[in-house]
Amino acid sequence: MLSLRKTIASLVRNRGRWEKLLRAARRAPAPGAGAVPIRLQEAHGFGSNPGNLRMFSYVPAGLKTPAPLIVVLHGCKQRAATFARDAGWLDLAESTKAVLVLPEQKGVNPFWYDVAWVAPLVGLLGANNQNACFNWFQPDDAAHDRGEALSIAQMIAAMIARYPVDPGRVYIAGLSAGGAMTAAMLAAYPERFAGGAIVAGVPYGCADTVIRALDCMNPGVDRKPEEWRQAD
């Protein structure tokens, strides 16, 4: 008890000091405040774009020598710009002089996310997926030269044609639905990528409908390696 009383007494004595420090911390500018925000460039006319995706990119200033290209795929209910910033991709591109291409899914207004009666109206609202998820579970969007997969491949080709990008150093990474689409891209275009990273995604070929996609995520699907190899 003596130790507890001493601890409480010490906290009381130093209360004013801690309050001053906290007030100073609240007044201090956030890290990076005042710096010019890094903006992504939206590109048009990069191909036939059968998947109806938006294309954003970031190219470090003064890039002259062939640079690596990283394809970054966001998760559901996310946007390319916020994912690139919050996940540190823009900082990585600046520090390593890597070029980024950031496909963005067309979802409905965030106000309508998860609203059941909106689902049948997604196409009429100009969206591909209600919650802005990449359609990794749709065969017409996740196969070689089909839909969203082909749109992403066209973005890569456009970046290689327009900027000093090393074709031998093209990488892809994605989170959640973006991770699942990353798996699809690696399976559909293995010759295109030097490597990839799947974060919280699912294996390619796990689902071909929305219902099966939900099963892949929970409770999950367990298959033998040879069964996954045969998935299409």
PLM region descriptions:
Residues 183-201:
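Extracytoplasmic, non-cytosolic globular domains
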Residues 1-69, 81-99, 144, 149, ...:
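A domain-start/cap signature at the N-terminus of enzymes
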Residues 97-108:
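Conserved alpha/beta-hydrolase
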Residues 105, 197-206:
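Active-site nucleophile loop of the alpha/beta-hydrolase fold
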Residues 71-73, 103, 199:
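Alpha/beta-hydrolase
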Residues 61-65, 115-123, 129-177, 187, ...:
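Gly/Ser-rich "nucleophile elbow"/oxyanion-hole loop immediately N-terminal to the catalytic nucleophile
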Residues 75-79:
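Active-site glycine-rich loops that stabilize anionic/oxyanionic intermediates
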Residues 80-86, 111-115, 129-135, 184-185, ...:
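Short, solvent-exposed loop/turn and secondary-structure capping segments
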